[in-house]
């Protein structure tokens, strides 16, 4: 039985009712759970298995029975590893019901169904004597995230030791160490603070007001694939430094809040702006099985990994994982240090779920510190990517080139700016526009831009919450409609076609509206690629460490078909891929005729060798009709695409990705000959529908 759910269509801005399977929420939760990514992490799987084998063997040699508790069993793979290694009993718990039911089927299929006691509860809800007959003396769990403690590991381990484990219980992993490395990066700080905006001649157009300069920003982590940060875009100022250790085995409770003040020495002059963060775990009690999430330059096994992965780029020789990444934390007030060897104090905090940092020239007093938070509206309103966009020099220059020409071409230019947080619209006032009206429906964004306009003494700027507020006499005076475009509700690049929807609304008010529109057009491009790793998030597992997990694949595939969009947004600069052809234009949209339905189709010949496991998609915005490359602002590659080589992507926007279904092992040989990508696209702008279809075929096959 179908049901209806209300969703916001980002392209039309309207709430619409969408027919869904009655189990849609279930399918969405399964498809987005992300278990598959972990199961492709060969290092994690092998080291958990080795730790279980060594630990259980040592317990056996000591004459101890082995009673295992697996918290958050997922597919049941750790429970099966424990039994294979010789455990006497295994109890596993899983609170996510679809996963628990799948785990039971997987256990049955692998011959372990009657040997694992599966409890469909959270570990903190388990009752001794009811759910478990006795306490366990070996805990195996994967309760960690990028921040280590963000999924509640502290509380879960404390409860387990108090209620579920014996006094002498061992844990896998046994310990964790968190690392910090101070760094300076003009690139990364663009994700956190607002710079001045200057004209093409270097004249200052907009200065950030005091509220932005004094704001500490958000303490929340910025999780990234740190190894993909261009090596020439940052300087590390200190060696990697242990900041916190977590002993998961000790009976004594792990503290929920701690402070650690470290005296560190810089290796080169610079400004302490960022903290690079990662962690390392010792899976067994002896610390023989180490797993590090360090970026490649700080990885303890880099030399060995480089030898065994000599064909890969250096940044990709360390094991890839998307469930445990690295993080950037931004220092509230960057600390300038002038001499190599100079010392400073790094103040590190954690509570039960998160970490935060600060830097000081002199030793600060040890005292409880609250997490810093945004007080300027910028960080609470916009994403890291959007803040980076606002600072992006090359991008801004292309818009400013258009705006300078537009403003100076008329004796008095009157602009209507459509979009959220458009500083460039404010800049047009500083360039000499007669008046600027900014559409700003969001309160915090409107308040921020109002403060910037006031600080820069822009007297001819006004704000409206909707286009319907504009009176006919105001619309009649407008000479230019401008947008980047950017809207807060947008996820995929073409969601910003909401710009076209707003133009249609304006035409409804004044059908004869005659103005210059920028961007005047947009084009969607596609590029077939070979992802080095990203495709694994949608690739079937098959078998893992000798266990058959095809039932898990089937469950995820069924749910993905119901709940996962055919195209999803990904920051591709973090996920290397090789181009297999030149980009091809799929769709051209003219904003002076936005309401027209469009359909097109074609074929892309793959000209470079490699497995096509995805298609990257993006939008190029054409600012003016002059066809100059300087009039194009792209959300795709930042350099010319060369088939067979890695693509360099814009780092301040997410691209669209369509994953090509990965064949099973027995089909890969056949599919390797498929060298053509058929595509089709259907666009219905008034309904906010944009649908893609892609399929691989060999040149001898007929297209459908």
UniProtKB/Swiss-Prot annotation:
Any one GO molecular function term: protein-arginine omega-N symmetric methyltransferase activity
Pfam families: PrmA, PRMT_C
CDD domains the record matches: AdoMet_MTases
PROSITE patterns xref list: SAM_MT_PRMT (PS51678)
Family under the similarity heading: Belongs to the class I-like SAM-binding methyltransferase superfamily. Protein arginine N-methyltransferase family. PRMT7 subfamily.
Record's function text: Essential arginine methyltransferase that can both catalyze the formation of omega-N monomethylarginine (MMA) and symmetrical dimethylarginine (sDMA). Specifically mediates the symmetrical dimethylation of arginine residues in the small nuclear ribonucleoproteins SmD1 and SmD3.
Designated name of the protein: Protein arginine N-methyltransferase 7
Species name: Drosophila grimshawi
Lineage: Eukaryota, Metazoa, Ecdysozoa, Arthropoda, Hexapoda
């Amino acid at each position: 039985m179908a049901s209806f759910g209300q969703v916001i269509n980002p392209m039309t801005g309207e709430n619409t009712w969408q027919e869904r399977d009655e189990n849609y929420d279930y399918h969405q939760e399964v498809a987005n759970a992300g278990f598959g990514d972990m199961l492709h992490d060969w290092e994690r799987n092998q080291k958990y298995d080795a730790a279980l084998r060594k630990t259980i063997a040592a317990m056996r040699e000591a004459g101890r029975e082995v009673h295992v508790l697996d918290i958050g069993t997922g597919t049941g793979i750790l429970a099966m590893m424990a039994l294979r290694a010789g455990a006497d009993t295994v109890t596993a718990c899983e609170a996510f019901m679809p996963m628990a039911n799948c785990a039971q089927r997987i256990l049955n299929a692998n011959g372990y169904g009657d040997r694992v006691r599966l409890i469909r509860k959270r570990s903190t809800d388990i009752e001794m004597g009811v759910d478990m007959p006795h306490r366990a003396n070996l805990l195996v769990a994967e309760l960690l995230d990028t921040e280590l403690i963000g999924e509640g590991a502290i509380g879960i381990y404390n409860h387990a030791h108090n209620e579920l484990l014996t006094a002498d219980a061992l844990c896998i992993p046994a310990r964790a160490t968190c690392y910090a490395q101070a760094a300076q990066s003009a690139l990364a700080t663009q994700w956190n603070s607002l710079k001045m905006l200057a004209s093409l001649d270097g004249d200052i157009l907009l200065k950030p007001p005091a509220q932005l300069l004094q704001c500490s920003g958000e303490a929340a982590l910025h999780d990234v694939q740190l190894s993909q940060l261009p090596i020439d875009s940052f300087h590390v100022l200190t060696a990697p430094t242990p900041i916190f250790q977590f002993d998961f085995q000790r009976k004594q409770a792990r503290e929920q809040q701690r402070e650690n003040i470290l005296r560190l020495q810089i290796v080169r002059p610079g400004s302490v702006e960022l903290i690079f963060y990662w962690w390392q775990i010792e899976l067994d009690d002896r610390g023989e099985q180490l797993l590090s999430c360090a970026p490649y330059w700080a990885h303890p096994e880099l030399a060995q990994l480089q030898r065994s992965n000599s064909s890969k780029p250096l940044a990709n020789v360390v094991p890839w994982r998307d469930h445990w990444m690295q993080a950037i934390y931004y220092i509230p007030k960057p600390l300038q240090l002038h001499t190599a060897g100079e010392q400073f104090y790094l103040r590190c905090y954690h509570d039960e779920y998160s970490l935060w940092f600060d830097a000081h020239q002199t030793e600060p007093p040890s005292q409880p510190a609250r997490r810093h938070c945004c007080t300027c509206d910028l960080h609470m309103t916009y994403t890291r990517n959007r803040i980076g966009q606002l600072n992006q020099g090359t991008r801004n220059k292309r818009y400013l080139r258009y705006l300078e020409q537009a403003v100076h071409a008329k004796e008095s230019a009157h602009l209507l700016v459509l979009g959220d947080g458009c500083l460039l619209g404010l800049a047009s006032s500083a360039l000499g526009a007669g008046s600027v009206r900014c559409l700003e429906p969001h309160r915090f964004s409107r308040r921020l831009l109002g403060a910037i306009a006031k600080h820069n003494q822009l007297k001819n700027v006004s704000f409206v919450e909707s286009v319907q507020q504009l009176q006919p006499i105001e619309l009649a005076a407008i000479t230019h409609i401008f947008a980047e475009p950017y809207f807060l509700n947008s996820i995929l690049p073409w969601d910003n076609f909401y710009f076209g929807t707003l133009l249609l609304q304006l035409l409804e008010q004044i059908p004869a509206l005659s103005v210059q529109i920028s961007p005047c057009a947009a084009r969607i491009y596609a590029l077939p690629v070979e992802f080095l790793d990203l495709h694994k998030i949608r690739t079937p597992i098959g078998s893992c460490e000798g266990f058959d997990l095809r039932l898990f694949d089937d469950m995820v595939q069924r749910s993905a078909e119901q709940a996962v969009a055919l195209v999803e947004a990904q920051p591709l600069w973090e996920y290397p891929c090789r181009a297999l052809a030149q980009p091809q234009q799929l769709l051209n949209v003219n904003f002076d005729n936005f309401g027209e339905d469009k359909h097109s189709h074609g074929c892309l010949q793959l000209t470079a060798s490699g497995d096509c496991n995805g298609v990257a998609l993006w939008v190029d915005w054409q600012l003016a009709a002059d066809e100059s490359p300087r009039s194009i602002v792209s959300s795709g590659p930042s350099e010319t695409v060369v088939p067979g080589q890695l693509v360099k992507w814009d780092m301040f926007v997410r691209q669209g990705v369509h994953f090509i279904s990965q064949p099973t092992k027995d089909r890969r040989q056949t599919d390797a000959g498929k060298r053509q990508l058929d595509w089709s696209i259907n666009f219905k702008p008034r309904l906010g529908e944009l649908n893609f279809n892609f399929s691989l075929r060999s040149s001898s096959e007929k297209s459908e």
